């Protein structure tokens, strides 16, 4: 569960290393976001010469959470960290590579480009 002020790792090569959630999209009173949800973030740590810089406000989709998510068959999938991938307004990823595993739930939320770039889909 990601909420405003939560910090997440960035799992792509846009140059951002860490972002902080500032808004959960999808309703005026929505408090939490899970895997596959879109959030508005502020870049808190970035590498020099990247696509984004520190202080930029960007949209991101959550690809891994410590909380995990329940699947249809009753199993749970959990990860070791909270991670997001930066996206454009049309939902395509801003980077050209994805690092680490991503959850299969992204396929249901129509983030097929992220799923195809990911090295492992769990």
UniProtKB/Swiss-Prot annotation:
Organism (species): Caldicellulosiruptor bescii (strain ATCC BAA-1888 / DSM 6725 / KCTC 15123 / Z-1320)
Family: Belongs to the universal ribosomal protein uL14 family.
Lineage: superkingdom: Bacteria
Function per UniProt: Binds to 23S rRNA. Forms part of two intersubunit bridges in the 70S ribosome.
Xref: Gene3D superfamilies: Ribosomal protein L14 (2.40.150.20)
Gene Ontology CC, one term: cytosolic large ribosomal subunit
Classification via PROSITE patterns: RIBOSOMAL_L14
Stated name of the protein: Large ribosomal subunit protein uL14
UniProt xrefs under InterPro entries: Ribosomal_uL14, Ribosomal_uL14_bac-type, Ribosomal_uL14_CS, Ribosomal_uL14_sf
Keyword Ribonucleoprotein: yes
